[in-house]
Each structure stands twice: as structure tokens, then as C-alpha cells.
């Protein structure tokens, strides 16, 4: 893994041809098979799917995705000071959870801010296994296509590859991912 980490671009690095950010090449081997997501989607049934789609639509109703860069300058000639700031979406976001985690509504609550603010690269990472069917269905309906199964060590490697970077990490767990929380704090990943 370390060899791949040295040669692959960091998460959020733009592809030379498309200009869009992308995940490092090594993570593709850890992508969850689309067949699992399709199976979970079918098992969920129309009522469940409608509820999830309604929830995501409610998020969008109040805050449509804004993939914009805002540059603001303020000057105060009397004091001689000025301030300049640029606001833009983070280049990447990772929502990580364990295989035991099944709260689809909370997962949507964790991933929707990244969608709404226009984060171009969003990954859902199940640490140590395969996501539950309710989570796969929710991710599919939210439009999250980058769903991976990584070990603690692999997620740590991904976080280290993003440095220095202003991405975001959301951990949904009941204590099992505390080591990753501490590592993210040490790397200054919010």
C-alpha cells in the first residue's frame, strides 16, 4: 500500500485530462460492487425508497447545491486595514462508518451537507466490512457513487495522502473508530 501511496495523486488532486478531483488509484480496488447496491435498492421496496428520496429532496429544497467560489474583499481606508477571503467547497469529504451501523437517516444527515455545499469528491467508507443494506440504499438514492470498504489502516493511509488538504471527515460510530478520530485531529482534518 505504501508504494501506491507514493505514486498516486493525493485525494482531491485534479485529473490532468478532466480537471476534476479524484481519489488515489489504489482505492479503486476497495470499491463496493455495484451489484450489492442494486440488490439493496431492490430489497428496500418503493415505500422505503420514496421516504429516503423525500428526505433528500427536503434538504435540497432549503439549500440547493452551490458549487461556487466566493471572493470577498473589505477595506477600511480610515484605519488602513483590508481583509480578503475566498470561500469554496472542500475538495473532498469522507463519511466513515462500521458494518454494524444501520442508521440510514443519520448517514443521510452526515452526507447531505457535503452534497449541498458542492463538495466534488464524496466517499462513503465502511471500515472493516460491507455496509448494511439500508445504508447502501440511502447512499444510492443520495447519488453517492464512491462507496468503499477499507480497513482502519487503509483509511488512515487515505487521510495521510490528503495532507495538506482542507477536506472533511465524518465518523459515524459508537467508539470503534476513536483511533481514526484522534489521527484526523492530529492531521488537522475537521
What name fits each language-model region?
Residues 30-40, 127-130, 135, 148-154, ...:
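Hydrophobic/basic alpha-helical segments enriched in Actinobacteria
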Residues 118, 142-143:
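Short, structured coil segments at secondary-structure junctions
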Residues 19, 44, 48-58, 89, ...:
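General structural feature for long, well-ordered alpha-helical segments within catalytic domains
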Residues 73-137:
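Conserved small-residue-rich beta-alpha loop and adjacent elements
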Residues 65-70, 94-97, 147:
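Acidic/glycine-enriched edge-of-secondary-structure segments
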Residues 59, 63, 110-111, 139, ...:
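Hydrophobic, Leu/Ile/Phe/Ala-enriched alpha-helical segments that form helix-helix packing faces
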Residues 1-90:
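N-terminal Rossmann-like NAD(P)+-binding subdomain of aldehyde/semialdehyde dehydrogenases
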Residues 143-190:
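Conserved NAD(P)+-binding/catalytic subdomain of aldehyde/semialdehyde dehydrogenases
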